[in-house]
A protein has these predicted regions:
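Long, contiguous bundles of hydrophobic transmembrane helices that form the permeation core
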Residues: 5-103, 220
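Hydrophobic alpha-helical transmembrane segments of multi-pass integral membrane proteins
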Residues: 120-122, 145-187, 196-197
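Core transmembrane alpha-helical segments of multi-pass membrane transporters/permeases
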Residues: 76-84, 88-134, 150, 159
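Short helix-coil transition sites and intra-membrane helix breaks within transmembrane domains
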Residues: 114, 126-132, 161-173, 201-210
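Hydrophobic alpha-helical transmembrane segments in multi-pass integral membrane proteins
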Residues: 64-68, 117-135, 186-194, 239-249
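Hydrophobic alpha-helical transmembrane segments
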Residues: 4-8, 53-58, 80-84, 116, ...
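Small-residue-rich segments of transmembrane alpha-helices in multi-pass membrane proteins
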Residues: 40-42, 110-124, 175-186, 235-240
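Juxtamembrane and boundary regions of transmembrane helices in multi-pass small-molecule transporters
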Residues: 2-45, 199-250
Length: 250
């Protein structure tokens, strides 16, 4: 719940900004005569017999509820249990809509393995980069920046997350190095936590990010050249805008 008021404002602002920007990009493309490509192997959409849209909220509520209840006892493992609860809830609520359950499980497992491999490779790269002398020199330079400590902390975390290609990986590497320094300067722990959480979601989704690679190459079967720009706008520019707003509010 650290600085939750700022988090709520920033999250709402980012969601609205991203939605409006994405709608504008789609409208501009349609006006220019662009259309979606149809490829062999694309899933065929169903027009009837779909579950009620409200049932999509039930698994989300299950994830949030289980994570909230088990957070104190299981710590980070609570997220894994919560996601499993969400998957099982989808299965129970929409059981009659599954046509080929083994096929769905097979595709889901394959997608999960690809995502794990991509993310592990990128985070592993970041862990190796952490051991280099240049990384230590970069951290020293970032922590010695003049001005507001929250600003220098946000810059440091953003750049480290960009180097590792992972928000969580960037936090895992940055916090043990940066938190003692900034807390020693008297920075409020709640404000530091919120800034770090938001800052790690900026440059983390550069082209080498595991999620970006999986989404563009694996899921959409596109190239970075044709598909990365909209993703860059939504996952880099919008979060950086949210970070600036958070710093102004804090």
């Amino acid at each position: 719940y650290a600085a939750w008021q700022v988090s709520l404002v920033v999250a709402t602002l980012m969601a609205v900004t991203g939605f409006v920007w994405l709608k504008w990009m789609i409208s501009r493309s349609l006006t220019a005569g662009e259309r979606y490509d149809v490829r062999d192997g694309d899933p065929q959409p169903k027009t009837g017999g779909l579950p009620h849209p409200a049932t999509g909220l039930i698994p989300l509520a299950a994830v949030l509820g289980v994570a909230f209840v088990l957070h104190d006892s299981l710590k980070q493992s609570a997220l894994i249990v919560a996601l499993l609860a969400g998957v099982l809830t989808v299965l129970v609520v929409n059981r009659k809509y599954f046509i080929n359950l083994p096929h769905a499980v097979s595709n889901g497992t394959l997608g999960a393995l690809i995502a794990i491999a991509n993310t592990a490779a990128v985070v592993g790269f970041g862990a190796i980069a952490k051991l280099s002398p240049a990384f230590g020199a970069a951290v020293d330079s970032l922590t010695s920046l003049p001005g507001d400590p929250l600003v220098s902390a946000s810059i440091a975390v953003t750049l480290i997350a960009g180097l590792t290609g992972s928000a969580s990986g960037g936090q895992a590497i940055a916090l043990p190095l940066l938190a003692p320094h900034y807390l020693g300067l008297g920075v409020d722990a709640n404000a530091l936590h919120r800034v770090v959480a938001i800052a790690s979601g900026g440059l983390d989704s550069l082209p080498h990010n595991g999620y970006v690679v999986t989404t563009i190459r694996g899921v959409c079967r596109e190239t970075h050249k044709s598909a990365y720009w909209p993703m860059f706008c939504m996952t880099v520019l919008v979060p950086l805008f949210g970070l600036i707003v958070a710093l102004l509010l804090l």
